[in-house]
């Protein structure tokens, strides 16, 4: 994972200390997310690993708690990863990763594509 994609510990929310293996199901990405991944040179597999392992990125405390509960009750799981601007080449922003409640699919997308 590029160093820029490591969220500072104070901003990262989730169950990083537990050994979580969230089933991802079929993994897909929206066209907009793929453009951002390319423009920022992101390691999408690394981000999916973080999501799968319970590192929810920069979600709110409320959303982090909801994700932790979703692991127990089978609800949807949302991670958010802030993107740095890449030297004027691409603006910063945010990338979401959502795993469906039934764990059949995980989607990488931009918040505007939700």
For every predicted segment, state its role.
Residues 1-4:
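Short, Lys/Arg-enriched N-terminal segments with co-localized hydrophobic residues
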Residues 9-84:
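Compact soluble domain cores
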Residues 77-114:
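Short, compact, well-ordered microdomains
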